[in-house]
């Protein structure tokens, strides 16, 4: 399901959110170093690290941020979001955009292929190493890949016309920092899209949107078979 969230006319900026119903990695089953998925009328080849469970088991310690390797999987939300970006391709062309938590890079690459000027950001440097490779595998011009913590924005205030993220929140404590980032980075009249699988944390996020005078609506819904 895709939500469109825009501010109250007397408030600040606009945004959109995407929501769908699956929550299983598209690579469920025997692990392969390359995935091929079809989105936006073409195939995409995506290289990734070991499967999430193997990476998880190899981790020897957790920090306060519990940096679990979600980035190495391709989640159904990313395909829903990719299709939504394709529907918005005329609006995206030539615009400064940011993929919030880009992982191995699918939606950043889709938007770059569609003509947007994309920043792909992730908290994990290893994710961006694979995202960069995936641009090469798919003959897409490299987005600007950057390691960034959404709690510490490294972009100019109100500089981005569109911001999106695919299933980026796993705990309620993520909701406020994500919304803070959107309020900081999104340009006047801009929009943000969040694809999500109806996880409870997004109820918290939507409540925060309302409390901060952001209006939202579902604009796209799609079932994805893992």
Predicted stretch roles:
Residues 2-226:
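S-adenosylmethionine-dependent methyltransferases
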């Amino acid at each position: 399901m895709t939500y469109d969230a825009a501010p109250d006319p007397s408030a600040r900026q606009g945004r959109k959110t995407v929501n769908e119903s699956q929550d299983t990695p598209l690579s469920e089953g025997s692990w392969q170093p390359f995935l091929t998925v079809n989105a936006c009328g073409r195939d995409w080849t995506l290289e990734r690290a070991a499967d999430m469970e193997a990476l998880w088991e190899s981790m020897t310690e957790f920090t306060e941020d519990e940096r679990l390797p979600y980035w190495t999987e391709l989640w159904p939300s990313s395909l829903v979001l990719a299709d939504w970006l394709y529907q918005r391709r005329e609006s995206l062309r030539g615009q400064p955009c940011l993929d919030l938590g880009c992982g191995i890079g699918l939606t950043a690459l889709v938007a770059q292929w569609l003509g947007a000027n994309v920043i792909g950001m992730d908290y994990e440097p290893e994710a961006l190493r694979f995202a960069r490779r995936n641009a090469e595998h798919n003959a897409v011009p490299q987005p600007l890949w950057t390691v960034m913590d959404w709690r510490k924005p490294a972009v100019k205030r109100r500089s981005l016309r569109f911001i999106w993220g695919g299933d980026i929140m796993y705990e309620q404590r993520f909701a406020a920092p994500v919304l803070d980032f959107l309020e900081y980075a999104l340009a006047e009249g801009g929009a943000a899209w969040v694809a999500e699988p109806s996880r409870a944390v997004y109820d918290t996020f939507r409540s925060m949107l309302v409390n901060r005078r952001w209006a939202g609506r579902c604009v796209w819904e799609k079932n994805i078979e893992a």
